[in-house]
Amino acid sequence: MRLTPTHIKGIKVAIYLAAFLPFLWLVLSVDQGWFSADPAKDIQHFTGRMTLKLLLATLMIAPLARYTRQPLLIRCRRLVGLWCFAWGTLHLISYSTLELGLSNIGLLGRELVTRPYLTLGIISWLILLALAATSTLWAMRKLGAKWQTLHNLVYLVAILAPIHYLWSVKTFSPQPFIYALLAVVLLALRYKKFRNWWR
């Protein structure tokens, strides 16, 4: 069955729910005290994992559309990408306010220098910021061929973000490795595309 624009609208509603309902759960968890003895760390990890999940979902859309021969699925990619940026911003805010504290926000610059995994995180967020800011049709027309070059930086984020997660975890957990493996698989699916860049 071929997807129609009506189907895509329904899928977008599902994306909104899948991306927004975890935020409501996060708020409820904070209010009800469902987190561990270190809720600040739990919130940071939760928002970070949501960012990674949405990043991987964004990267999954193109190969899924190609292999299932459903080209209209591409219309969902921008929405997932914007939610990825939104959760990435929540992740940055949670670290800045809960880990450092509002009174020590000026320490963020020093933290970026002394903790390399934070450097990878902020680079990833800045790229997502640029992609979100230029995700409109107007920006696409304005930038021309440069638009695609800029948005190819999402592949760099797909490398940096899992490393950021792996590096930041103090105790062993399989989750960072799972996300890293999924990122490698999704990048490997684009092997021919990357190979053509070097020709």
Swiss-Prot record:
GO molecular function per UniProt: electron transfer activity; FMN binding; heme binding; metal ion binding; oxidoreductase activity, acting on diphenols and related substances as donors
Assigned GO CC terms: plasma membrane
Transmembrane segment boundaries: 10-30, 79-99, 120-140, 149-169, 171-191
Claim: Membrane is one of the keywords in the record: yes
Cofactor: FMN; heme b
Cofactor stoichiometry and binding remark: Binds 1 FMN per subunit. Binds 1 heme b (iron(II)-protoporphyrin IX) group per subunit.
GO biological process, one term: protein repair
Keywords: Cell inner membrane, Cell membrane, Electron transport, Flavoprotein, FMN, Heme, Iron, Membrane, Metal-binding, Transmembrane, Transmembrane helix, Transport
Cystine connections: none
PANTHER family: PROTEIN-METHIONINE-SULFOXIDE REDUCTASE HEME-BINDING SUBUNIT MSRQ
Record text on subunit structure and interactions: Heterodimer of a catalytic subunit (MsrP) and a heme-binding subunit (MsrQ).
HAMAP family found in the cross-reference section: MsrQ
Identification of the protein by name: Protein-methionine-sulfoxide reductase heme-binding subunit MsrQ
Organism: Serratia proteamaculans (strain 568)
Lineage: Bacteria, Pseudomonadati, Pseudomonadota, Gammaproteobacteria, Enterobacterales
